[in-house]
Amino acid sequence: MNKNVKINNPMKVITGPNTRWSYANVWEPKSINGGTPKYSVSLIISKSDTKTIAKIEAAIEAAYKEGEAKLKGNGKSVPALSVIKTPLRDGDMERPDDPAYANAYFVNANAISAPGIVDADRNPILTRSEVYSGVYGRASISFYAFNSSGNKGIACGLNNLQKIRDGEPLGGKASAESDFASDEDGTGKSQSLPRLHQGCRWESHHRSRASGGGKAHLP
């Protein structure tokens, strides 16, 4: 086989360059509700980016078909895709009070292993303050089926990130704990917690010190 030939994975998606990163906990894994520490990011995709949306919908469908046996479990039939949890969510419906999510869909992605992070020229980004909630870039993500204690759905795994440009640092009203508590493997229930995303707090402090002051990125 030619080593240069890429094997197409229908469950893998590279988002468009205008995808915005929110709750970017990508430098250190974080444990949520006592679970396995993971890296995570909320990917905000404009509804006008129909190409990326279509690719994600197709990948979710592929993950559903590939995971039918897992989704069926001990049941008599495979549940319909329309009745299980899926990761592509409507920002206008779920985040009506957050301008960053207006006219956009979003996908929460996470991983146990650290994502590779590069710049627009594909050089590794080593300075943590360069990546924060609010930047724009591509994300390499993969979709897969899960069935945990009867909680069934399609989840999104985070592979790699490519920062394209800076953006206005984002604030956040919902916590990362709330967003990711039940999305990855169906364990636990989402709860609205008052504390902020620790990765964003660290980044805010780091950037504040680097600039000699300034406002934190999250209220």
Where are these predicted regions, by residue range?
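A broad, structure-centric signal for solvent-exposed, well-ordered loop/edge residues
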Residues: 52, 114-116, 163-171, 200-203
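Short, basic/aromatic beta-hairpin or loop at an interaction surface
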Residues: 106-120
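Compact mixed alphabeta submodule
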Residues: 118-192
